[in-house]
């Protein structure tokens, strides 16, 4: 099992709601083509909307990087002007714990519960980072909005930075 997990979460049938899955699919495609080099110790997983079913997937990892759509109230940001569609926000598991009653997204509370359960079962996860992308639309459809699609390269760069921050480098 790879010690670093990149987990895309979301429902690809609801446009921007599926951004996490779209990004993991993009990274997987690029890695297969050789245009994206990842360390051997990194696993890319499409988590869909599985929630607590991901317990075994995240258990025992040194670092878990979750990519998901997030909705954050503008007043919760130091700079509300930067919270528009396509904005990328970084959260930690500790941030989720402090906001466990807040509704960051449809998945973040489930993620918090899954992480808590992993700890209770002795399957602790090391560092958890959530890269959240603010959606423009959650309408039915398969394509990302232009604003969210434009954020994809930035999110991939941030994922790569998170990977190298723990000392893992492409082989």
Where do the protein language model's features map onto the residues?
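N-terminal catalytic or cofactor-binding beta/alpha core of small enzyme domains
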Residues: 1-120, 124, 130-133, 142-153, ...
């Amino acid at each position: 099992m790879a010690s670093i997990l990149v987990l895309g979460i979301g429902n690809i049938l609801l446009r921007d709601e599926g951004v996490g899955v779209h990004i993991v699919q993009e990274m997987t495609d690029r890695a297969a083509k050789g245009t994206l080099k990842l360390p051997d110790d990194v696993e890319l997983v499409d988590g869909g909307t599985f929630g607590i079913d991901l317990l075994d997937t995240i258990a025992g990892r040194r670092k878990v990087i979750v990519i998901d759509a997030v909705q954050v109230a503008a007043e919760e940001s130091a700079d509300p002007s930067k919270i528009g569609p396509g904005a990328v926000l970084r959260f930690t598991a500790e941030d989720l714990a402090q906001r466990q009653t807040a509704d960051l997204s449809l998945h973040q509370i489930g993620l918090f519960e899954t992480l808590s359960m992993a700890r209770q079962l002795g399957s602790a996860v090391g560092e958890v980072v959530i890269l959240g992308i603010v959606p423009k639309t959650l309408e039915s459809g398969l394509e990302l909005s232009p604003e969210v699609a434009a954020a994809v390269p930035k999110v991939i760069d941030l994922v790569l930075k998170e990977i190298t921050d723990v000392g893992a480098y492409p082989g």
